[in-house]
Regions:
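Conserved helicase motor core of SF1/SF2 NTP-dependent helicases
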Residues: 76, 83-175, 196-210
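Accessory N-terminal region flanking or inserted into the helicase ATPase core
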Residues: 2-78, 87-92, 107, 117, ...
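Conserved interdomain hinge at the start of the Helicase C-terminal
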Residues: 179-193
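Short, flexible loop segments at the rims of nucleotide/cofactor-binding pockets, characterized by
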Residues: 54-56, 81-83, 175-182
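Glycine-rich phosphate-binding loop signature in dinucleotide/nucleotide-binding domains
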Residues: 71-72, 100-101, 189-192
Length: 213
């Protein structure tokens, strides 16, 4: 439900904060006090429900992993798509660095591809870490996936990002093409074959589903 999504977002962004729900209320501009009270009660009831039945949700695995310090022994630690990690997931990374015995930690990511801030991604942590002089940065200067036309557009769009890590890389040696598709001209094509439409929230899925029906 939408309320459960708000609770999970609060735990992802503020894993240690006792006032995590008030914090997330301010961010989501949730001004309905009745809804706030309902969410707070839902959080309490859900925690008790899971505890009584020994049930777990996605965020609970991170909470227990950090609490129990149940890190496996590792020689090397690799973290991919790091720009999408939440504050809670960064805690997991930090705990692994401390408890796993890893000799080196390799973290891969691209702040320009950070598209999950709405789901709690802590891009500021990623940027701060990349700017830390104690860390060694190894830029990947050659893309083997992006053609020239897409590289040109992506570079132009990236310049509008207010806070980012400056970077330069070369596209693959192919002009390629870029297409801008609109839902309207796609309507006819939706009559045939299988289509997958991705939406950010269940509410949008519902609206799209009703429209297509």
């Amino acid at each position: 439900s939408e309320y459960q999504d708000i609770i999970n977002l609060a735990y992802a962004k503020y894993p240690d904060a006792e006032d995590r729900l008030p914090k997330i209320f301010r961010e989501t501009t949730l001004n309905n006090y009745g809804a706030r009270n309902m969410i707070e009660q839902m959080d309490l009831d859900l925690r008790k429900f899971k505890e009584d039945r020994d049930k777990y949700e996605y965020v609970d695995y991170f909470v227990n992993f950090i609490k129990n310090k149940s890190a496996p022994k590792l020689k090397y630690l690799f973290i991919d798509e790091a720009q999408d990690l939440s504050a809670q997931q960064w805690q997991v990374v930090n705990m692994l660095q401390q408890e796993s015995g890893a000799l080196e930690t390799w973290i891969a990511g691209d702040d320009d591809q950070a598209i999950f801030r709405w789901a709690g991604a802590d891009i500021e942590h990623f940027i701060t870490m990349a700017n830390d002089d104690n860390n060694t940065i190894k830029p990947l200067t050659q893309s083997y996936r992006i053609p020239i036309s897409v590289h040109t557009l992506a570079t132009k769009l990236a310049q509008s990002i207010s806070r980012r890590i400056p970077k330069e890389y070369k596209p693959r040696d192919e002009e390629g093409e870029r297409k801008v598709l609109n839902i309207r001209p796609l309507n006819k094509g939706l009559q045939e074959g299988d289509w997958l439409i991705l939406c950010r929230t269940h509410e949008i899925v519902k609206q799209v589903s009703e429209y297509l029906e």
